Amino acid sequence: IGGGVATYLLQFAKAAGAMVYVTSRSQEKLAKALQYGAEKGLLHDEDWVEAMGGGKVDVVIESVGAATFDKSLDAVRRGGTIVTFGSSTGDLVTFDLRKFFYGQYTLKGSTMGSFEEYEAMIRFVEEHDLHPVVDAVYPAEQFKEAFQRLESAEQTGKIALQIG
């Protein structure tokens, strides 16, 4: 957890009634995620299944890519789903295909969705009064500093540019 999409996904999942576990490289970001409602925060380099007490999850939202895909597959229950929308650590992953089909997993790629899905999302946001977490707002002239903060991956939430 850390970026704007991940923090918003945490809010969406909580509003939908899900029990939410998040992962991060940063203890500080995990602490913030707990403040936003996550049940548990897992460090990226620990055994996620062990950290969850041996349990597995119904759905994994995978936004990192190659560096965490295998751990995501290990953490999802038999018949569960992995939804992927990002690949910041690499586009190519390899995984045990036999384990995948014996596990009866579903793998779903996602981008922006359809117009109908967008409308449903807007209704959900309004109904649950969701607001994105904003880490920092920079004047447009400081766009380089804003991108440096984004590149550093130190933010928790959105980085915004103020225009005008």
Which stretches of residues belong to each language-model region?
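Adenosine-nucleotide cofactor-binding segment
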Residues: 1, 14-71
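A general structural signal for well-ordered alpha-helical segments in protein cores
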Residues: 30, 57, 69, 97, ...
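Conserved helix-to-beta-strand junction in the class I
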Residues: 74-76
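Residues in the short beta-alpha loop(s) of Rossmann-like NAD(P)-binding domains
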Residues: 26, 88, 113
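C-terminal hydrophobic helical "lid"/dimerization subdomain
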Residues: 115-164
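Hydrophobic/small residue at the entry helix of a nucleotide-binding pocket
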Residues: 4-5
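Rossmann-fold dehydrogenase core element
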Residues: 78-83, 94-134
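Rossmann-fold NAD(P)-dependent oxidoreductase module
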Residues: 8-12
